[in-house]
């Protein structure tokens, strides 16, 4: 072929170009790439386009359109699209709230090895939402989620080991799972591991480590991490006593929705 014509980018390349455009805040160009990829039946393109309509950054927010695009993505075996549909049906955003459908989409996401989908499915079985409550199944899906590097799945499995629910109580295993959750940037996992270090359960008692983990949890926007760290600053445990810092962490906990922290602030 003469004329130096470049080959048309394939659907995967179109998605990559769209992501690059999105990162560069060129949302209009990103939308064009995603539309083209989705038109070529690329699930990732449809899912990414759905995200644009979901967050309303580059196009007018349209949850109905987002739901349609996520549905197409899911049908094209794009796990993230199925997981997004779980969220829409669970919260009733852009579609009528339907917990049974939410569970079905979480299950499909998990079948497609989407770790977040498996974690959500574990939560649904653990709470009996959209499916019959079954802690054995919850543990199974948390375990699969954790194997797929979903921090929430590791953390929730850790809780079952700490409590001895449907698995034999094992605090060392719980500590390991919280540690993995924390490494995967799950704030609650960091907080729960911090509490084990604070109490010396499953690990050797270490208040400095507890403070570090509560701090990490707080950075990851886990309100209970912020309030736990505030208590350490008040008591001078694992950190130097500092009431100003304690107040800052109580304030952050309140902003993140910790009602007890808000009550403490009101009393000041």
Protein language model features and the residues they cover:
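Alpha-helical segment of the N-proximal tetratricopeptide repeat
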Residues: 9-36, 51
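Short helix-capping/linker turns of helical repeat alpha-solenoids
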Residues: 9-10, 21-22, 39-43, 55-57, ...
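Terminal, low-structured helical/coil segments at or just beyond the last alpha-helical repeat
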Residues: 11, 252-268
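Hydrophobic face of amphipathic alpha-helices that form TPR/SEL1-like repeat modules
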Residues: 14-21, 48-55, 84-91, 120-127, ...
């Amino acid at each position: 072929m003469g004329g130096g014509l470049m080959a048309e980018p394939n659907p995967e390349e179109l998605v990559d170009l769209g992501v690059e455009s999105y990162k560069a805040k060129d949302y209009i160009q990103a939308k064009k790439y995603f539309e083209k990829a989705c038109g070529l039946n690329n699930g990732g393109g449809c899912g990414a386009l759905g995200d644009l309509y979901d967050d309303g950054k580059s196009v007018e927010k349209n949850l109905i359109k987002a739901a349609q695009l996520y549905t197409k993505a899911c049908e094209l075996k794009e796990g993230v699209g199925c997981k997004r549909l779980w969220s829409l049906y669970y919260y009733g955003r852009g579609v009528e709230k339907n917990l049974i459908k939410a569970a079905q989409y979480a299950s499909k996401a998990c079948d497609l090895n989407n770790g977040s989908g498996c974690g959500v499915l574990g939560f649904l079985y653990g709470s009996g939402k959209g499916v019959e409550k079954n802690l054995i199944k919850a543990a199974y899906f948390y375990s699969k989620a954790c194997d797929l590097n979903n921090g929430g799945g590791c953390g929730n499995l850790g809780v079952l080991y700490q409590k001895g629910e449907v698995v034999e109580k094992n605090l060392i295993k719980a500590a390991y799972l919280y540690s993995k959750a924390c490494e995967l940037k799950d704030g609650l996992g960091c907080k729960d591991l911090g509490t084990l270090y604070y109490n010396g359960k499953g690990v050797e008692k270490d208040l400095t480590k507890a403070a570090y983990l509560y701090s990490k949890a707080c950075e990851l926007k886990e309100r209970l991490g912020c309030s736990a760290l505030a208590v350490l600053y008040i008591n001078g445990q694992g950190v130097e006593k500092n009431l100003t810092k304690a107040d800052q962490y109580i304030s952050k906990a309140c902003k993140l929705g910790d009602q007890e922290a808000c009550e403490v602030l009101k009393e000041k």
